[in-house]
Structures are given as C-alpha cells and as structure tokens.
Amino acid sequence: MNTPSRFTALLARCTFAAACAAACAPLAAEPLAGTLAKIQQSNVIAIGHRETSVPFSYVDASGKVIGFSQDLCDRVIAAVRARTGKPDLQVRFIPVTSQNRMPLVQNGTVDLECGVTTNLAARHAQVAFSTTFFVATTRLLTRTTSGIRDFPDLAGKTVVTNQGTTSERLLRKMNEEKKMNMQIISAKDYGEGRLTLESGRAVAYMMDDVLLAGVRQLSAKPADWTIVGTPQSSEAYGFMLRKDDPQFKALVDGVLAQAMKSGEINALYEKWFMKPVPPKGLSFDFPMSDVIKARYAAPNDAPLE
C-alpha cells in the first residue's frame, strides 16, 4: 500500500510525464531538424549554466548545477529525451559568463543556455529566446551605512556591475548623459562583483534586483546590505537558443507554457524564492510580482524594452 509521500511522488512523476508528452505532441509527426537532430545524432545535449547566479543557476558544494532556471531546464531535457527517443541522453554542463554565453550558443557549443539572460530585441540578430520565465528590475546593492539611496547618489563614486549586461550598458549611458563622473568597474561574474563590493573598492553594485538579493545572501552578514534605487529597467529572462530553429524553440516553449498552465512553476517559485535555499539555507523572501503573474497567465517571449 502506498504511503501519502509515495503517492505524492508518484503523482508528481505522472504529471511531469504528461507535461513532457504534451510539449512534444505537436512536433511528433515532424522529422527532426536543427538542434534536435544534432542532439539525437550525438546523444548529448549541451546545457549552458551560470556558476554563482543564486537562486537561478549555480553550483552547489557537491558540484551539481541547481536553481530555479535549472529545475525548469531539467523539464526541457526530459522532453528532449522523449522527442528524440533517447532515454539515456547525456547532459553536458558548460559554465558560461555574461561575455561568452551568446557566442557559445551561436557556434553550437551550447544547445540551450539556462541561466539569467535578458531577452533584448537587440540580441535577436544573434540568438533566439524562449518564453519568459522571470521578470526582474535593475537596482543597486549597497551597505546600509553607505548613504546611497538612489542613482543620483552615485555621482563621483565607484560602482561595480557585470560586464556584457544590460546594467553595464545603462550605467555607462547614465554616466555619460548625466555627467556623473562615476568610476565603473566591470566584473566578470557575480562572485567577482560581490568581492569588489565587499572589499570596499565599489560603493554600490548595479544588477537585477533578484540577483542582488542572491549576492546579499552570500555575504558574511546579509543584514549589512540593502537593495535600493529607482528601477532603471525591467528584464525578461528567457532560455537562450540558436535562432532560426523553430522546432527546438517550440519544444522549449511548450515545456515552459505547460509548467505555467499546470501551476507547477508556482511551486518551483515557492521553492527557490520563498523557502531556504543552498548554500546558506536562507530564504530570499522575494514574493512573485504582478508582472511575473501576468506572464505566467499568458506565456510569451516578448522583450520588455
């Protein structure tokens, strides 16, 4: 006789299998092409991931890639296994940065980038994006005692951001147009950005608010840091894939849309943004915004520019 926990696990597996079948059904009659044909032939799918983008895509103490993005990505991988008829499909995890993520997708090294990449119209010439799975805003992380409360307070100060990001572009534009005389440090990733901030080399860190919450969580004393500033942009996160590959994009979009339609994505959101997560077992306490709820109610891949 099944115990309640075993029954729940069985139900979850059945729901997941049904979702995969639903995502693959519209494509079942089509011969495989593009990325799916490549994956079937090689029996390998290459997944791009981040190393320190808590809680979306990062590496835990055991070396496993985890996070909200990765949980969704795992569902795509299951659908790819079903569509290609490769239950033993191998997964190759490839760490990516803000600088190399697009080239690695373009040149075929990475089949699907499951990180924290913003869907920008300007990027559509190089890559394609899936249905949006998260929406963030760009703000500042600073010490509670710094006196920084908004972007005008950064005049004459040193600020860190991540190289190759929307935040870097916006910060440099602001600096030039408003003659703020900021010194801007471009970090290669969130780990380097956090160290730059904590060491005092920068007075503030500009990035997406939810990622700044992750940086704060990783600090020795999270209560010493605060997220401030008028949002400078809204960022629609999507999985990145090669352009002109409608078959693969339809599969990825189908998996995400099914997760939203079934409500499964709400449970994943609760897991990663409202409950304790590794590595410190702290909760982000980051409730779902109305903008995100609207996206889940009507899934689409439109950028927010």
Go through each PLM region and give its residues.
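Extended ligand-binding regions for polar small-molecule ligands
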Residues: E30, L36, D71-A79, P152, ...
